[in-house]
């Protein structure tokens, strides 16, 4: 046990400092030369940084230090999947985002072998339908443009994840994903009333991105520390415009506050989740969430995804149900997030485990 503990601690600190260095490097900064800037609109494929899962969204998406994860952990910290209870888990969530952007998320994870720790393997999918838009072309007329039908942008990410626990306190995991985005086709030159279309361009692109992370149970009550880095990828180009993916580095803690009281832990649970997030294209901020669970069946949740940042996104809240039936663990989740002048966003999720 001591050997496992020493190994876990060494791995934790090695990965922490390694990823911190790489995060600075991909941003073109070093800890000694960083200049304070207002980081906005510096990345593409932003759908990769949108939190879709209903349970996660309800607690402010502070999921980095989740110890006993599920297949949905691949979207936050793949290492949490290493302690997945049972052998199989599947989950799906739908979300109608701002401007009626339709998100669909699905994941499946399974533990191969029987009685041996071969880790956990998972497959994940995120699909986005941005709806239908009018296609216009600049022209020398009174309006300055003419309409040329419609187009429907889409985006998708398909991932393959793996996680493995070492002992009962440490787990590491990674997720490799193919990312696609199709913004339709467009005309590369303006339309002149006396001329015509010179060329067209196809604005679709694909690339490979990598996520990885670790979780570590400290041994102090149920306190867990986690770290993840998401969306590592090379620079992308649309015709002439270059952009990066939304690289994000996170470190978080989680704990059941009931451990600090005399309350019966079999009846009640109050999970505290806190993440510190450093995105490539947004200000550093804190994510915060609380989840109260009664008898491992009914959960009430609340949180902030951008605590301390002046943005339209506000408080999130939600609820969940868990029930065992014939050996299956069945669950349903709902989340509500206030986006100020943009209205509210709802998420509905279902899951099943065996």
Which sequence ranges carry the predicted segments?
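Cleavable N-terminal export/targeting peptides
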Residues: 1-43
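Subset of outer-membrane beta-barrel
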Residues: 26-354
């Amino acid at each position: 046990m001591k050997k496992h503990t020493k190994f876990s601690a060494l791995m934790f600190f090695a990965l922490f400092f390694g990823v911190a260095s790489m995060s600075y490097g991909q941003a073109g900064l070093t800890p000694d030369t960083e200049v304070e800037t207002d980081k906005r609109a510096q990345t593409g494929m932003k759908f990769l940084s949108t939190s879709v899962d209903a349970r996660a969204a309800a607690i402010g998406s502070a999921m980095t230090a989740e110890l006993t994860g599920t297949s949905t952990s691949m979207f936050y910290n793949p290492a949490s999947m290493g302690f997945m209870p049972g052998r199989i888990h599947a989950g799906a969530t739908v979300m109608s985002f701002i401007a009626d952007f339709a998100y669909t998320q699905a994941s499946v994870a399974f533990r191969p072998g029987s009685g041996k720790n071969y880790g956990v393997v998972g497959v994940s999918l995120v699909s986005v339908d941005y709806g239908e838009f009018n296609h216009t072309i600049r022209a020398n007329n009174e309006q300055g443009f003419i309409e040329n039908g419609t187009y429907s942008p889409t985006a998708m990410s398909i991932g393959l994840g793996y996680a493995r626990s070492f002992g009962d306190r440490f787990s590491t995991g990674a997720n490799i994903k193919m990312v696609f985005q199709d913004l339709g086709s467009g005309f590369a030159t303006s339309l002149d009333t006396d001329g015509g279309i010179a060329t067209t361009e196809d604005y679709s692109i694909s690339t490979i991105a990598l996520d990885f992370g670790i979780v570590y149970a400290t041994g102090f009550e149920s306190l867990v520390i986690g770290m993840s880095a998401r969306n590592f990828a090379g620079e992308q180009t649309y015709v002439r415009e270059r952009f990066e993916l939304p690289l994000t580095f996170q470190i978080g803690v989680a704990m059941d506050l009931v451990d600090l009281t005399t309350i019966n832990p079999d009846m009640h649970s109050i999970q505290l989740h806190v993440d510190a997030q450093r995105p490539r294209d947004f200000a550093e901020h804190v994510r915060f969430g609380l989840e109260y669970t009664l008898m491992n069946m009914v959960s009430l949740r609340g949180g902030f995804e951008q605590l301390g940042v002046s943005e339209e996104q506000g408080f999130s809240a939600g609820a969940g149900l868990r029930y065992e039936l014939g050996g299956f663990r069945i669950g349903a989740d709902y989340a509500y997030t206030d986006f100020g002048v943009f209205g509210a966003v709802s998420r509905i999720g279902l899951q099943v485990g065996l």
